[in-house]
Amino acid sequence: MTDQQSRPASPRRRSTQSIADRLALDALYEIAKTFAAAPDPVAEVPQIFNVLSSFLDLRHGVLALLAEPGEGAGVNPYVIAATAFQRSPEAPAADVLPDAVARIVFRSGVPFVSFDLAAEFGAEAVPKRLRDAGQTLIAVPLRDPERSHFVLGVLAAYRSHDHNRSGFSDADVRVLTMVASLLEQALRFRRRIARDRERALEDTRRMLQTVTEQRGPAAPVSLDGIVGSSPAIAEVVAQIKRVASTRMPVLLRGESGTGKELFARAVHAQSPRAKGPFIRVNCAALSETLLESELFGHEKGAFTGATALKKGRFELADGGTLFLDEIGEISPAFQSKLLRVLQEGEFERVGGAKTIKVDTRIVAATNRDLEDAVARGQFRADLYFRICVVPIVLPPLRNRKSDIKPLAQLFLDRFNKQNATNVKFAADAFDQICRCQFPGNVRELENCVNRAAALSDGAIVLAEELACRQGACLSAELFRLQDGTSPIGGLAVGRVITPTVRVSAPPPEPAPAPEPAPEAPPREEVPLRTKTAQLSREELLRALESAGWVQAKAARLLGMTPRQIAYALQKFEIELRKI
């Protein structure tokens, strides 16, 4: 043993080492506290690097994880956190951590130290910001909390050194290894909490299902003819009960055939105006001139054929409710006239000068995208805000499938009463009906039930007797017409078509680019079947994802109308997601 080896460390060296150990201990204490209180440990890594920089002068911290865990052959790290680097999110991970270093740590699973990255891996391997100063890189593996043999990521930091490489010590490796261990424990604890939470939620779902099965099916919600037990229809009924007692205008929105007039009558029946009149006007069925006369009335002699004074619908609905169906179809010129009576409750008859005041509650309905119409200048924004005080969205029948059977039974009972018959549906017939999508909603369901009952040979309708089992489903035929596959002359006799499942055709083989097509006509002039035939399922899904699954926004992205988007959703059997 030499004298130098046996010589004890000097007091100054021991003091310096003691201070370094104390700083390392303090740093680990702060890091442990941070991880213990963090709901997301990875999100706290930048703060951890700040602690290492403040206490131990370890700068330029980097945490990189595998982009595709489990694929050892293709190590593809991406940086989660990188402090003290001027780096854009789009910059590659190699800007802060050399790829060669990441591969070494991922594959070996042991710490790595480099005093001169440029000498070992080339000048290009060194981050640009660190090329002008001596830097020691310390990188340690971050292991999967549940598979210790699998390296999940790399935790690295840089320390500046002089030409003698002073400043670095084995303590740096030990500290970073302990930080990685603390992060692993925090991740393990977080995963355990997530699993326990999921297990508790699953137990709760099972208990609720058991209780529901023991209680039996919920009683159908019935409110002035509204039938259903689904959560979607229950929410609509609850909204109607909340707003019916107020004087606020209600806007009913939904697809065609969802029963908007029925819900409008429910609003009226639940309101204090229930004993007053309920007057309905279909705004789409009348021209602008006739609509003005119908709503406001006219004086005798106001125009040719006005042989007597006629009260308008606003007057007739005084003290009650006026239902303006298809309000989205009125012309921009008439919208200003309607706005005045909605704002002030007064108007003049056509050809008259006397101002008439009324107390009428407005319930409007539309299946149009009014927001899109406002953006296009087709619908006045001030009128939109006046009628859309309480919007109620009526769910399509495909989103309330548990209501199909009670509704079908209601229509069957009504058919029997009207025709003095006693037709019943077999269980398999009900099952078949409940599997259908019904793009025409409740109106199509009623058509299906009445058709099956009218054409039935006996007292019981079997599944085989339904139109969809005989290749004569009306909604399926509509889809074939849009796709251009319907045979000329009508329905395809003998072809079995099930409208509940529609499989899209495989994409065609790539073909040479066609000749430039002539300029397309305006969007309103493009037939539905042309647009939907040109649209692919993937294009529709991409547009819906970009639009947050809002049909109106997706329609604008694709240059289509919301109605065309609705047909495309039915065509490709895509269910809307709630975000």
UniProtKB/Swiss-Prot annotation:
Location of the DNA-binding region in this protein: 551-570
GO molecular function terms listed in the Swiss-Prot or TrEMBL record: ATP binding; ATP hydrolysis activity; DNA-binding transcription factor activity; metal ion binding; sequence-specific DNA binding
Location of the region described as 7 X 2 AA tandem repeats of X-P in the Swiss-Prot/TrEMBL record: 505-518
Entry keyword ATP-binding: yes
Binding site for a divalent metal cation: C468, C473
Sigma-54 factor interaction domain segment(s): 226-454
Pfam families: GAF_2, HTH_8, Sigma54_activat
Compositional bias per record (Pro residues), positions renumbered to this chain: 505-520
Keywords, ordered alphabetically: Activator, ATP-binding, DNA-binding, Metal-binding, Nitrogen fixation, Nucleotide-binding, Repeat, Transcription, Transcription regulation, Two-component regulatory system
A GO biological-process term: phosphorelay signal transduction system
Repeat (Sequence) residue spans along the chain: 505-506, 507-508, 509-510, 511-512, 513-514, 515-516, 517-518
InterPro entries: AAA+_ATPase, GAF, GAF-like_dom_sf, Homeodomain-like_sf, HTH_Fis, Nif-specific_regulatory_prot, P-loop_NTPase, Sigma_54_int
Residue ranges of the region described as Disordered: 502-529
Binding site for ATP: 254-261, 317-326
Residues in coiled coil: none
Residue ranges of the region described as C-terminal DNA-binding domain: 537-579
Quaternary data: Interacts with sigma-54.
Role noted for this protein: Required for activation of most nif operons, which are directly involved in nitrogen fixation.
Stated name of the protein: Nif-specific regulatory protein
Gene: nifA1
